[in-house]
Amino acid sequence: GLASIGENMDQEWIRRGRDWLESCQNDDGGWGETCESYNFPALKGRGPSTPSQTAWALMGICACGDPHRESIRRGVDYLIRTQNPDGSWTEDYTTGTGFPCVFYLKYDMYRQHFPLLALATYRGFALGWASCRAGTARSLLPRGLRRLGAAASEA
């Protein structure tokens, strides 16, 4: 969002945000945070990796402008490694907030939509958006896109 309105993405405060995200990356390459972080602020940015939270972190770091960061490679590897054979991702943890400390929401499509969006964003970012043609994008994520279509038709 900031880059789209002409903000300089190399500003110190933006780099600090990126660095914080990178400091929260788990050893498996993903990112996660549990709902307990609302009760215990020391848990912010900490928790088991989830596909949706990994995707959010990846898109944030990609927006900072350097496609060759180790954190990005590790996050992309996490998403590829944890994708199920049918193209879906499993997400056992709640990642949606209803009212913090009162109730939480499980948005079942978060685990499908956001990893696909993050992988497509990374691909366009790393290879250059001009090289992203519809046929190439379809070949990159065929299982996931089929799974999204199947899930939508089941709803």
Could you say what each language-model-derived stretch is?
Residues 1-129, 154:
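An alpha-helical repeat/solenoid feature that recognizes helix-turn-helix modules
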Residues 133, 138, 143-147:
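Basic polycationic patches enriched in arginine
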Residues 141, 154-155:
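N-terminal charge/polar-biased segments
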Residues 150-151:
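Short, intrinsically disordered C-terminal tails of secreted or membrane-associated proteins
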